[in-house]
A protein has these predicted regions:
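N-terminally biased helix-coil "hinge/interface" segments that flank
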Residues: 2-343
Length: 345
């Protein structure tokens, strides 16, 4: 029997994947030796994200000569949600507003967002102390659900002071789930902060992202299973932390600025930079983050992406919808004199 010192123990490896707007990057990292075992880059197939992920994983395992059983974790950061908001490419969703008057509905970015997303307003809502102001009236909901059933892929619900008392949001959610199997987002699940218009925007954007992130997660899980990888799947949030794929499946809005967060956290760690800027020029967007005292600076009022102010905790990033994959053309009618479009290869 060999001595303990001569027994070669399998080393745990971590797979990192970034599904960007242009390329999907992946690598195998060994925490024990602090080395990158292998890395690959493949074009992102927007119609079938799973094919890009599958190709990247295959190259990683074969070229890196790593067994699937030695993989301890699969971590994913993605610019998918960020790019979808910048490009206005989220899936259609409907908003149900409870107890919100005209003054509230006309604030912030909500009116613009509702131009292309149907909504219905119900009587109800609570006071700032959580007391019911008006009984919930769901009578307009059934006809509304029938009207939008074929035109949307999800629903968002926001209620007046639902962070103080979520009962009306919960009741409406149950009714929607009884009528349809589409995903439902409650604003009170995304933030405990006041500001109903901002919560409404965050919830509606989340509902628009659910189908996109679902397709991504299904692609990753399908590929890992095909290669025999049983390691947990973790997703990076916009604040640089990792959460489970189940968490992200219902709260994809938490992944906005996930890609830039990964760049900022990585740059801070690798450069030992105390104060500075991190500029990440991708294929679709260019992102600028700030490092102060060795750490990425957080956005105090919530992440802002594509002109939308959200209640998502994230690093402070300035995102422009221009990258190496962008095509710039003269446009006399535009305010800037130019127009941007994307060329996906």
């Amino acid at each position: 029997m060999p001595e303990l010192s001569s027994v070669v123990q399998p080393q745990p490896f971590t797979i990192g994947i970034d599904t960007g707007g242009t390329f999907t990057d992946a690598l195998i990292y060994c925490p024990t030796t602090d080395t990158i075992v292998n890395k690959v880059k493949v074009p992102t197939n927007h119609g079938q994200l799973d094919t890009s992920i599958h190709a990247a994983l295959g190259q990683l395992l074969i070229d890196g000569n790593i067994l699937a059983s030695d993989i301890a974790c699969v971590s994913v950061s993605t610019t998918l949600a960020t790019n979808a908001l910048v490009e206005g490419a989220g899936r259609p969703a409907a908003l149900v507003a409870i107890g919100l008057g005209d003054t509230v509905m006309d604030r912030g970015a909500l009116p613009g967002l509702l131009e292309n997303n149907p909504h219905v307003r119900l009587q109800g809502g609570h006071s700032s102390h959580g007391d019911e102001l008006d009984p919930l009236d769901t009578s307009p909901l059934t006809s509304f659900l029938s009207e939008v059933d074929q035109s949307v892929e999800g629903f968002a619900i926001v209620g007046a002071f639902s962070v103080r008392n979520p009962s009306h949001e919960l009741e409406v959610a149950n009714l929607i789930r009884h009528f349809t199997e589409m995903p439902v987002t409650l604003s009170c699940d995304l933030s405990a902060q006041l500001n109903a218009p901002k919560r409404a925007v965050t919830a509606l954007l989340n509902a628009r992202l659910v189908p996109l992130i679902t397709r991504l997660l299904e692609g990753v899980k399908r590929s890992t299973e095909q290669y025999g990888i049983s390691a947990p799947l973790m997703i990076m949030r916009g604040d640089g932390s990792l959460v489970s794929s189940d968490f992200v499946a219902s709260k994809p809005i938490e992944t906005i600025l996930s890609g830039p967060a990964a760049s900022a956290v990585g740059a801070a760690a690798l450069s030992s930079l105390h104060n500075g800027l991190v500029v990440d020029i991708g294929g679709t967007t260019t992102d600028v983050a700030v490092i102060a005292q060795g750490k990425p600076v957080a956005a105090q009022a919530g992440a802002v992406v594509g002109g939308y102010e959200t209640m998502v905790n994230a690093i402070r990033v300035h995102t422009e919808g221009i990258g190496g994959d962008s095509y710039v053309a003269p446009q006399p009618l535009s305010r800037s004199g130019f127009t941007l479009s994307l060329i996906h290869i």
